[in-house]
Each structure stands twice: as structure tokens, then as C-alpha cells.
Amino acid sequence: MSIQTKQNINVLSANMHNASIQTAIEQLISNQSLSYTQSKALFDEIMQGNMSDIELSALLIALKSKGEISDEIAGAAASMRENALAFNTTRNQLADCCGTGGDGSNTINISTTAAIVAAAAGINMVKHGNRSVSSNSGSADLLKALGINIEMTPAQAANCLEQTGFTFLFAPQYHPGVRHAMGVRTALKTRTIFNILGPLVNPAAPEVQLLGVYNPNLCLPMAQTLRTLGTKRAMIVHGSGTDEIALHGPTTVVELNNGNISEYTLNPSDFDLANYSLEQLTGEGPQYNANVSLAILQGKGDEAHNAAIIVNVAALLYLSGKAQSLKDGAHKVHTLLSSGQAMNTLNAIIEVSNG
């Protein structure tokens, strides 16, 4: 093949690439949604560094203006999972609990502490997370403050899961392609689809997920997205202004049960718990939050802090089939916390992750 022919093919390929992006942007501006396949193809281009900043800015804003639907979110998430560093394990029925963040509540690290307690309760927890974006302390910040190695290789992470029932996958390490979008995301200074993709792109593809969202309108599309991605059991929650199961008011829930989706409301009484104010769960920096987590794991936690962990782990036990109901799960977690056994799990995680 001549050099001129190769150059012509490259030009043709570039023109086709630009045309498909332009078509997608015009489609979105016309208020027409992208298909799962279109979205996945576009995000493959982003993850592989093949989209210019101007094209990416236009695409993200056009998506945001129209409003992302589940097929668009699922296509983007599938692309990110496919382009991620692989994580393999012999364990099955993996679970994760996390939130989108962005609710402005700055609580203690509830889902991260809950993940350690859930591991102590016999659930295979693969926590996928990052450093703080919208709060005082992200999951990675807390785990590092507790002495856990947050930058394990995939082999080390798999070993940690198999030895302790818990592991951590540090998002920047597993999703190198996201760096291609960082400049645009920083410059735009507004929420985009990337703000909701974090909880959906765990490289372990967990079968069970407890996912908190900052806006109740995201509950249903996120459940539909997880169904498309193959998740078996999930609860998408928004608790009275927070991306958590609330203790200070009602929680909107959309539950995914092997393809079936149902919607309902939960209150603390559904866990046999009293109500607590959001102020009672206020967190600070990583070291303060780590001390709070240590107290909880040692069985010396504040009542409100314990309650926040109980509702999350109870939901995970229910979703994993290890509790008959949320109340049954809550009683199991209360007993576990009182025993201080969860501290043994943390110590094992610290030892194995640094080994």
C-alpha cells in the first residue's frame, strides 16, 4: 500500500469519526436521545483519547441539556468498564455500596465504613472509589487514613478480597482513559454525565449494588442502567436530600430484582431504628472520619453513627439474600457492631493490602 493511499484512508477515517460525533451532537440538540450503541461508541472515542476538547465539551453539554436517559448512561458505563484495567477474582456474588456524591451534606464516610462491616458480615465487598471530589473525605482518603493500601495492583486487590472479604479498586488506577476528559470537566465547572458514572463503572461488575444518588429523579434511570449492565440486585436510594438511606426523613428507593423494578419509600422505622438529624452525622477531614469509623468498628460508635452503618449493611444483607428483611438485616448488623468483630476485618485488610 502506498504512502498516499494510507494517508487517504487516515483522512477518510478521521472524516467519518468527525461526522459521527457531529451527527450525535446535532441529534442531541434536536432533543433526540442516543442509542446504547451510539453512546458506547462515543465514549470509546473519549476513553481512547480520540475526541477533541471542543467536540467533548459540545457532546457533554448537549447530553446535559437534553437530559441523559438510561441507554445513554449504560452505553457510557459499558465503555468505561470495557476500557478499564481488568480485575479478576475467584469470589462470586460481589457487592458494592457507594454514592454519586454531590449532595453537599459532608457526612462521615458512611458507605466506606459500611463496606468493611458488610465484609465482616460475610459479603464479598469490592469497593470502587476515589479521593474526595465533593466532600471533606472520599473513600480513598478514609481508607488511606485507616492504614489500608489504596493503590493495590489487581492481583493484590484480588488476594485481599479472597483473604478478607473486602477490597478496594482505586478509580484513577483502573480508568486511565478518564484523564482525556479531565481538562474539559474542570473547565466546564458544571455537572455532566461523568458525575453519575462513578458508581456504575466498578471493574468487578458487582452483581449486588447499593447506590445513592444526589437527585431523586436519577433513581429510576440508574436502576434501568444497572439492569442493562447485567446487575442482578440493587437498591438506588435518595434520602431526603442526600445520596444515602436517610435517618432524618423518608428515603426514595428504586429496587432492581433480577430484571424487575419496583419503587417505594423507606423510613428508619423499617429498620427498627429511631430518627436522627443529619447534623448528627456531620463529618470533617479524613483523620476525624477515620476516628469515627474506628469507634464504629470497635463497637464503641455513637448511636447515630451506628444507625447510619446499620441501614446500609442491612440493605446489602437483604440484597445478597443473607437477611429475610431489612429489619432482620438491621438486627444482625447491630449484633455484629456490638461485638467489635468488624475491627478484626479491618486489621486483616490493613495487613493483607500492605503485604
From Swiss-Prot:
Q: Respond yes or no to whether keyword rRNA-binding is given for this record.
A: no
Write down the superkingdom of origin: Bacteria
Q: How is the cofactor bound?
A: Binds 2 magnesium ions per monomer.
- Gene3D superfamilies with a match to the protein in the record: Nucleoside phosphorylase/phosphoribosyltransferase catalytic domain, Transferase, Pyrimidine Nucleoside Phosphorylase, Chain C
What does the UniProt keyword field contain?
Amino-acid biosynthesis, Aromatic amino acid biosynthesis, Glycosyltransferase, Magnesium, Metal-binding, Transferase, Tryptophan biosynthesis
Binding sites annotated in the UniProt record for Mg(2+) 1? S111, E244
Q: Which reaction does it catalyse?
A: N-(5-phospho-beta-D-ribosyl)anthranilate + diphosphate = 5-phospho-alpha-D-ribose 1-diphosphate + anthranilate
According to its UniProt entry, the protein's GO biological process terms are: L-tryptophan biosynthetic process
| Pfam families registered for this protein in UniProt | Glycos_trans_3N, Glycos_transf_3
Give the record's GO CC terms.
Answer: cytosol
Q: In which pathway does it act?
A: Amino-acid biosynthesis; L-tryptophan biosynthesis; L-tryptophan from chorismate: step 2/5
Q: Which residues cross the membrane?
A: none
- Amino-acid positions noted as binding 5-phospho-alpha-D-ribose 1-diphosphate in the UniProt annotation, renumbered to this chain: 99, 102-103, 107, 109-112, 127-135, 139
**Self-association and partners:** Homodimer.
PANTHER family linked to this entry: ANTHRANILATE PHOSPHORIBOSYLTRANSFERASE
Which protein family is it in?
A: Belongs to the anthranilate phosphoribosyltransferase family.
| Protein name as annotated | Anthranilate phosphoribosyltransferase
The organism named in the record is Pseudoalteromonas translucida (strain TAC 125)
